[in-house]
Amino acid sequence: MADGVTQVDSTGLHSFSPSPSLSSSSSLPAVALSLAVSASAVTASYSISHLPPPPLPPVPTTMAGWIGWVFSFFFQVIPSVLYWIITFSTITLPTWLFTLFSMSLTFTMNFTTLLLIVLAVVSTISWFIRYRFLNMYSRLPPEPQRKEPQVDLFPDVQEGDSKPGLANYLDEFLSAIKVFGYLERPVFHELTRTMQTRKLIAGETLMLEEEKGFCLVVDGLVQIFVKSMRDGKSDTDEELHHLGAESSDEEHHIDGKQGYQLLTEVKNGASMSSLFSILSLFTEDIQLRENESSGSSSSSIALRAARVPNSIPTSPRGVMDSPSLGFQDHSDDTSNMITNGELPSVPPLHLGESRTPPSGDQHHQQHHESRKHSSRKRRKSVHPDIVARAMVDTTIAIIPASAFRRLTRVYPRATAHIVQVILTRLQRVTFATAHSYLGLSNEVLGIEKQMTKFTTYDLPNNMRGAALDRLKDKFIKERDRLGSEEVTKGIALHNPSAGRRRRSSSFLRKDAALQAKLMTPRRAATVVTPESAPAEHDTYGVSPGDLLSTIQSSRFGPRYEQPPAKLQTPLAEKENTHFRLPAMQARHTFRRQDTMDEDGLFRECILDCIMKGIGLTSSTRDALRKSNHSGEASPKLLSYDSRRQKAIFTNNAFGFIDPYEGSGDGETESLMSMSVTSAGGTSPVINLREELRNDIEIVYFPKGSVLVEQGERHPGLYYVIDGFLDVGVPIVDKGEDLVGVSKPAASKGSFPTLKRTTTANSVGAGGTAANDSRRRKQSRKSLYLIKPGGIQGYVGAVASYRSYTDVVAKTDVYVGFLPRASLERIAERYPIALLTLAKRLTSILPRLLLHIDFALEWVQVNAGQVIYRQGDESDAIYLVLNGRLRSVLESPGNKLAVVGEYGQGESVGELEVMTESTRPATLHAIRDTELAKFPRSLFNSLAQEHPGITIQVSKLIAQRMRDLVERPVTEKGVERSNAGSVQTATSTVNLRTVGILPVTAGVPVVEFGNRLLHALHQVGVTNGVTSLNQAAILNHLGRHAFSKMGKLKLSQYLADLEEKYGMVLYIADTNVSSPWTQTCITQADCILLVGLAESSPSIGEYERFLLGMKTTARKELVLLHAERYCPPGLTRRWLKNRVWINGGHHHIQMAFRLTAEPTHPETKRFGTVLKQRVQVLQAEIQKYTSRRIRQTPLYSAQSPFKGDFHRLARRLCGRAVGLVLGGGGARGIAHVGVIKALEEAGIPVDIIGGTSIGSFIGALYARDADVVPMYGRAKKFAGRMGSMWRFALDLTYPTVSYTTGHEFNRGIFKTFGDSQIEDFWLEFYCNTTNISKSRPEYHSSGYVWRYVRASMSLAGLIPPICDEGSMLLDGGYIDNLTVDHMKGLGADVIFAVDVGSIDDNTPQVYGDSLSGFWSVFNRWNPFSSCPNPPTLSEIQARLAYVSSIDNLERAKNIPGCLYMRPPIDGYGTLEFGKFDEIYQVGYAFGKQFLEKLKSEGSLPLPEETEEKKKLQRTLAPRRASI
């Protein structure tokens, strides 16, 4: 303290002032400063402690005082801290550094120490890089495989007894009359107002042939028996009356099976009447054939029309007994029969045989006295020898025959609709079952053959001679001009008025409709055409042999005579002149242009014969006129949109014959027809005849041309002018599908849409026909010939059936063709056409088909309803008519596994019925389904009388048992790894309806549906494909759209569409709460949930609605991408919360515009609008914030076959192409060359599966679906694997394997990164061997590198990979070529590439013992003749691949598998350095193999060959102007 002065200031604080000597000293400034600070601190503390305390400021008692005290404290402390920091950083720290650096240190160590230090540093760095930088693959977030979704099996709410009382009665009654289709309220009341009920006590019998009406069981159980054919027949009334009178004798008779056999048991809500008996009730007063003799004079027609009452039984008795007579004999026989007025007594028929009953002698005028007797006989002939017995006390309801007769008179259009519905179900239930399932082809085909006797009408005599020769000359000249190739398509005669009709058809139709509305009933019932000149017939002096006098006179007769004065009005006379003027002009034109009018007269004559053949004659029109005074309460007859017929007609040889384009709205058309009907008495006949005259086409087909193919919907009616048509059936060689109902009937590699256009020579080797003939090896069996004057396709075209036969031109044939659209217009305006067909069908029905029709039950089940449960007694076989069923196996532990799914045309339950065992699984309906129930009692009855049926069903069962036996071992378990494959295999087959549902509002489902529809058309769906949206449905329903009947009408319309088309797309383009969205969900076999990939993956409102409906249909997710790229992990985010997606997912590239508004915007609500806006904003923000590798796609599908919509279309219709790549180490590089050859050949790949190196190459191709990135990445990986340094650095102590597997993991991870299998553009899977559970596993989700690495893990070389506690090794140890699993995924054609090593099978003769020394010496001895024994490693390898070799041999024989093995045996497993060489070998082999397939015609691809280009040109054939 001597060097400074300390003083105290006025505040009581000490201050220190350094002395001048200390301040001037610069040697130790820091020391001086520190001393000064220390002295100051000591002095201050000493002074403060000894001096009296100064008066301190008062302690603050307020908040302001505390704040001031804190501020004063901080103003003193903070400056001192800052001062210390500054001094330390500027003075103290530099001083320390200067002292440290001025020091000198010396370290001494030897080289060993230095080396150890360096090794430690290097090891530390390498460990950090190896385990913290290069093994990023091990630090990925865990993403386990996605579990297979559980099977949805909701409780059956409809199980158990029905509701008691009145509700039970109504429910059972309504379920029974569903067979009539939708009924309007007046029609329903008309049917039920005279309904009667009847009580049957247990054991009471009922003679069904004596019951005059439609019978159904309301409560109880009734057994239906049939008289056995083996014990003789009982036809007389006395026997039947005695049988029905003595119930006790009858009971004993039936119980003892004395001559009767049980057909079926009828329970609550089922009908006791067959479909044919219902038709007979509607068609009592319908003629079988037109009375041609009465058509010679108009007066006779007028007289007969005046005498015809409301109900006349005028049906010939002996028409069915006459064989194929000459055409001139038909008129005489028929006229005599019709004059007699007796109805036919249809006898019991054996398999096509007929018995001739005696003809009646009553006269036509005595019909009133004989009506009851005739009706009773007719009813007996409709269902003879049928007896019903009540098992318990039963209540039945009977709708009497009088109700049906009155319904026919009061509501003829509704009657025709009911008849059409019954005819449709008759074909779907009875005919289809008998033909396809029971093998009763002769009985079914015999119906069409016998129908020709009713439809044969000859052309007039003067049109057969010189006129026909002139017609032939025109075609011969044109044929010579065109050449043989073009002629094979058929030549149509030029129709100059066809174009004018199409342009003005809508106007002409409305004009003629209004015209007919004002005409008298007499005039309206007359058909007038522009070519007919009524007044000038005698003026021109035409001879009686002229054409106009031979055309049906009834068309002109009423115009010659004076009508009754009370019916004639001046207005009608004025209106009639409107039609007479063109008639006079046409007559003069015939004088001037004989050739042109002769063609028109040919069309007139052909149309006359066709209309008489289908029952549209003058007498039927007159009879219809009396009762056709209603119609406002009847819906439109046709149950499908006629405008959609265009898509079908363009696919046949008559694509140029457009359907009626001017019809406009279908409902408007129906209303116009009904209003005209009620006003004028008939439909607008004049306009209809004019339209049909222009629709008639005269076509020439050369010998061998195919006019109609089996299974095709009839294009129309063919009237044979000259030549012969051969009707036959193709005979499939043995070894093919026996029945055709157990497998989808799709020919591989063919295009049915093109196949329908092969109207050329079917024997020729062109295009699809040649491929099909080679593939199926069919021969043909001729059934009967259609001669000139005959009509082909009557039943099929009028009733819209599919053809059971092929129709081939036996000779050069000239036919008149009337399109099916024209027939639909006829049936719509003249229901008598359908009634006539129904009458003819009931008259020629064989007894066997009648009994089958009685026993077959039409069953309708709701979505989710259980048909039978596992363990129930098997009482019936079920055939799917419409809808879809799923069979579910309930295993111990309440685990459910899908056994199979059954679509339209398939059957289930034969094995249990034949073996009388219990049901092996539970069967439930996926959606609303129509079934044909084939009871076991009917099967037993048929088996006793017709063993051929038993043989047919036994073949089906044997085929299914063979499939079960040959099912691979890998599919017999129900483990997680393969349960999904079984479900997928059955779910992708025979899909008939696909629902397209958006995830949320704003998804462009309409555009998506249109593109998918276009792709399905190009892929070629059997029988075509159509799409439905709300606009199409509203257009069809019209005024019934929002009524209860509209639902029934809609269900029938949708059922007809599913029968008509091979696939129907339901596009849900409405809001969530609309009924159409619900319909799309309930009608779908498969539901496609469409979402935008870049939008929010949250659950959408449509999905919530879908879940609320509890549908069990297959659900698939479709993600729409703006670019052909999927970021890693995107798909997993979508699938994570959607456990209900049980059908996989698809990535589709589709350019679209993001919009927040749906296609049909719903009601504007603030919450909904706000949510949509937020979603759009999220999507827009995600565009710029998401990490994406590239903003534009590097690889796009430039070839159409690689289009995403085509891939989805092939998956939906079961025509996917699979690629299976086998394992083999470096030999797998050949896979790259084979894939390139496939792309160059134009073969699309939809599913890829691989093993070992095949999984690596397959994953590369599935990622981008392009060869270019696959080639680059594969070559880079081969370079890494070919480096010996990497292999050497990865060596480890061989406790588990020789290497650690790190370098192998790195090579695979650098190739795939963090991508997941779900993100791949193509569907991909790889297989591994689970050595922990000793089973194969298939992986289709999770990290790619992980499961590809597991599939490539050779035992001993690389350690197994751990997955959920299990160890996975190379999948090739069990199955090196997974063709069977690929088949289970739904692939139709599979390319299997095998690159595995071939074992040395040289016989070994080294003896019973072996010395190792001798083995080594023998291996090095060049002169030894003994083969080298296998080494220990070779023996272990052969043991490991024993199972794989067995599966490989089985895979080669799987149908649809194309086995390929490139010549790569000379390359080793680890020779990755020979990449280019092995790649070229595979590429060359692939090109050679595919060229061979192409030359053989078995290349399954949509290739544009010259033959198919010719076929495509026939889609729009040219009209020959001759």
Swiss-Prot record:
Source species, domain of life: Eukaryota
According to the UniProt topology, which residue ranges lie Lumenal? 87-108
Motif DGA/G: list the residue ranges: 1370-1372
Record: residues binding a nucleoside 3',5'-cyclic phosphate 2: 840-960
Q: Show the stretches that span the lipid bilayer.
A: 66-86, 109-129
Q: Where is this motif: GXSXG?
A: 1250-1254
This molecule's function is given as: Intracellular phospholipase B that catalyzes the double deacylation of phosphatidylcholine (PC) to glycerophosphocholine (GroPCho). Plays an important role in membrane lipid homeostasis. Responsible for the rapid PC turnover in response to inositol, elevated temperatures, or when choline is present in the growth medium.
Which positions are annotated as binding a nucleoside 3',5'-cyclic phosphate 1?
A: 680-800
| PNPLA domain mapped to chain residues | 1219-1383
Q: Where is the composition biased (Basic residues)?
A: 369-381
For this protein, the Enzyme Commission number is: 3.1.1.5
What is the designated name of this protein?
Lysophospholipase nte1
Residue ranges for the region (Disordered) are 1-24, 308-384, 523-544, 757-776, 1501-1522
What's a GO cellular component annotated to this UniProt protein?
endoplasmic reticulum
Which ranges make up the Cytoplasmic topological domains here? 1-65, 130-1522
